[in-house]
């Protein structure tokens, strides 16, 4: 009646490329103003908070990988990949220092101690660790949502589902 939008899901932008700097600036502006952006085929997937947090937490479970990054052992990685992984690890560390994430921190620390001395194989895969990770906050909260809400509100859950497909294959 008033002509004002009541649901941001009523808005759609169509661009030739979501990689264009102007499109990225618009997406950043909208998200800084608490308007979620959904772009299913963009490189933005790996820039999402929940994706970086998962990857950082997974890496913290394997301290030898982190040592390898710090020592420059992975010469096959491009500098931007090393920077990205470090960013994920720093985000995970920041998140784990928050008191509300104490249980997650304790669990990851336990796994890190187990994996640092690992000599053989385990009876679980990366995907198994990922699903266990989802039992802890903040991931449990991201996944405990009403699936009948708008697409922008379920993006973290959708991204975690997509990441579980990637890791599980």
Where are these regions (language model features)?
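Conserved motor-region signature of P-loop NTPase helicases/translocases
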Residues: 1-73, 148
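Conserved helicase C-terminal RecA-like lobe
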Residues: 27, 58-169
